[in-house]
């Protein structure tokens, strides 16, 4: 069995880790970074960039660079209006009212884009481990719905990974924190403020058991929103100064986003920062530059409501766990946004002066925890048990559009529960089971997960038929619902996979397409390497021709020029196969070897001629040397004659 990797698939950055020698370690990407931007860029020629390379070209290719795709995965069109307005790339309605992105006339699902990021992480892990990677544990925000969890799992499948487990991000961070502290009984609160989501989880640690007591959160709160506040402030100020609305310029908007993120990071360690964006736009009077000063106090004023929004989920989680702030032993910070001083101060104030524990890296803790869980599943870690919970209540719609809960939130998973229902009208022969997730009283206010029909119920008076509805949640938090007529034994079930209309066949098709694209990426990389080799050989040939052209025979020059023409032709042919390119390269290299041999042979012949001339009485200085850069043989003349004086030497201290 190969290594199982742990992946933190984040909104703004992703990270991959593996267990080595019983300890989790982060795997650096091919660019040397320990985290990889969750960004995918599409070039004009069809090339696809992922991670740091995609981020570098985002300003000049804003409409074809996809970021924050995690905010769309497994969500409906009508639920994402705010997110769609923020991004420069095109969003279109997918099947079943989901959100797809449109790039150069082609639609991609969020699962496909996420799979491209996962493929990059998978490739980096394979390069590090030196072996193929086929299995992974992937983390999701604790407050992800069933549809979002299933969509994330589909993304892993498309990327060519068998997703052994989906675990919650705060739970993974707790694993990273508590791996070496399993003998200590303690209650910890994980405060996870990432790029796009916010989660709070309370866990009890002890005797190798990590038990989640309660979880709460907000899937629409994260670092992106903090950046957005700064962007809005810059747009407003620039409009006041220059009477130009930068919100209408997608390239300018992308520059503003990058500047806002940079300013936010700098203000975590500085009292103020300068924002300078030359040539941000232009009008009839000429180019315009953006120059602003942003103080930490002003930043905290801009994001005050967002910081306040982190308090209620903590109150809710403590209430659900029947705990008070003083009962918490450790507070763990996870996610880059927890570095913001105002966030930390709000947390310290809420816990009456208790400072958070800083023993884990906020950017890497989740991936490290995922690697630990991967080690558990791979048999590398013993005596560790993870007991997670379902973050939201699950149930069905009943008479009067009421949401009837079957599994309450914060129930430990895996779990299964059932409840008996009956018909609402006389003679009813079928019932529609409408499955919902949420906490509101009315069905319409909760998240719809799916519907199915149980037909063939014998006609009877209302309230007589007995229909048992069973809910089963697996270890990944993914739901299966069944309904059975107790009178006839007739049964119908559904596994909730309504994550954007992706059937099993479609997921498999996308996986095969991703493999083809990965192969195409590999081919492009090898093609670039071959072109670089060809460029080097052409430079060597030109240098040889310049320095030793008179020593190269005309016949071999003609042959070499033919090979040069062939090389130049294949370098400009995008359809050339790697095998053909390599063959042309090998042929040209052999020609260069022949030229080298020819140069040395002629140089030696010319040197022999010079020696003959010198034996006729000529001085070596009388001979012109047209050869530059060629080797001259070493001459061993015997100078011991009558005019040579022999001397003894004595060393003097």
UniProtKB/Swiss-Prot annotation:
GO molecular function, one term: ATP-dependent protein folding chaperone
Residue numbers of Phosphothreonine PTMs: 197
Alphabetical keyword list: ATP-binding, Chaperone, Nucleotide-binding, Phosphoprotein, Stress response
One Pfam match: HSP70
CDD domains to which the protein is assigned, alphabetical: ASKHA_NBD_HSP70_DnaK-like
Superkingdom to which the source organism belongs: Bacteria
Induction and repression of expression: By stress conditions e.g. heat shock.
Family: Belongs to the heat shock protein 70 family.
Free-text function comment from the UniProt entry: Acts as a chaperone.
Protein name: Chaperone protein dnaK3
Gene name as annotated: dnaK3
């Amino acid at each position: 069995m190969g290594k199982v990797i742990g992946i933190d698939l984040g909104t703004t950055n992703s990270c991959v880790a593996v267990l080595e020698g019983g300890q989790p370690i982060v795997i650096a990407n091919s660019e040397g970074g320990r985290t990889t931007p969750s960004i995918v860029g599409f070039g004009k020629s069809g090339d696809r960039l992922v991670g740091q390379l995609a981020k570098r070209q985002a300003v000049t290719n804003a409409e074809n660079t996809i970021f924050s795709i995690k905010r769309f995965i497994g969500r409906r069109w009508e639920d994402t209006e705010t997110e769609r307005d923020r991004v420069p790339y095109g969003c279109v309605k997918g099947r079943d009212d989901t959100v797809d992105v449109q790039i150069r006339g082609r639609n991609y699902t969020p699962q496909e884009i996420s799979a491209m990021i996962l493929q990059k992480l998978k490739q980096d892990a394979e390069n590090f481990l030196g072996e193929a990677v086929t299995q992974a544990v992937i983390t999701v925000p604790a407050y992800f719905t069933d549809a979002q969890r299933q969509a994330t799992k589909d993304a892993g499948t498309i990327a060519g990974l068998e997703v052994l487990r989906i675990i919650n991000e705060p739970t993974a961070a707790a694993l990273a924190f508590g791996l070496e502290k399993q003998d200590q009984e303690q209650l910890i609160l994980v405060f996870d403020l990432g790029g796009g989501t916010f989660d709070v989880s309370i866990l009890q640690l002890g005797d190798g058991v990590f038990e989640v007591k309660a979880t709460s959160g907000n899937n629409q709160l994260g670092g992106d929103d903090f950046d957005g506040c700064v962007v809005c402030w810059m747009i407003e100020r620039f409009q006041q100064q220059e009477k130009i609305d930068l919100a209408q310029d997608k390239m300018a908007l992308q520059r503003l986003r990058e500047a806002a993120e940079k300013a936010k990071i700098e203000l975590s360690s500085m009292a103020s920062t300068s924002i300078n964006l030359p040539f941000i736009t232009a009008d009839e009077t000429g180019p315009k530059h953006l120059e602003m000063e942003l103080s930490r106090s002003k930043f905290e004023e801009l994001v005050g409501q967002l910081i306040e929004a982190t308090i209620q989920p903590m109150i809710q989680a403590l209430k659900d766990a029947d705990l008070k702030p003083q009962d918490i032993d450790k507070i763990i910070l996870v996610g880059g946004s927890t570095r913001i001083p105002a966030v930390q101060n709000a947390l310290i104030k809420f816990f009456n002066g208790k400072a958070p524990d800083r023993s884990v890296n906020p950017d890497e803790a989740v991936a490290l925890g995922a690697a630990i869980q991967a080690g558990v599943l791979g048999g590398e870690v013993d005596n560790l048990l993870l007991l997670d919970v379902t973050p939201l209540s699950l149930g069905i719609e009943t008479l009067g559009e009421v949401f009837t809960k079957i599994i309450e939130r914060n129930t430990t998973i895996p779990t299964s529960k059932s409840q008996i229902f009956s018909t609402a009208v006389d003679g009813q022969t079928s019932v529609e089971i409408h499955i919902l997730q949420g906490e509101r009283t009315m069905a319409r206010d909760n998240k719809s997960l799916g519907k199915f029909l149980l037909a063939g119920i014998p006609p009877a008076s209302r309230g007589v038929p007995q229909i048992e509805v069973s809910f089963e949640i697996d270890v990944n938090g993914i739901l299966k619902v069944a309904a059975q007529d107790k009178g006839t034994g007739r049964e119908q079930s559904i596994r909730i996979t309504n994550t954007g209309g992706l059937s099993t066949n479609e997921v498999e098709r996308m996986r095969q397409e991703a493999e083809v694209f990965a192969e195409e990426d590999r081919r492009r990389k090898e093609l670039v390497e071959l072109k670089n080799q060809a460029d080097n050989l052409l430079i060597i040939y030109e240098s040889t021709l310049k320095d030793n052209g008179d020593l190269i025979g005309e016949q071999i020059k003609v042959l070499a020029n033919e090979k040069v023409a062939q090389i130049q032709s294949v370098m400009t042919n995008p359809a050339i196969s790697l095998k053909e390119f390599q063959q042309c390269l090998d042929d040209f290299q052999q020609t260069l070897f022949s030229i080298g041999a020819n140069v040395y042979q002629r140089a030696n012949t010319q040197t022999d001629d010079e020696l003959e001339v010198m034996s006729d009485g000529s001085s070596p200085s009388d001979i012109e040397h047209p050869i530059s850069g060629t080797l001259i043989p070493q001459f061993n003349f015997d100078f011991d004659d009558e005019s040579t004086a022999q001397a003894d030497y004595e060393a003097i201290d």
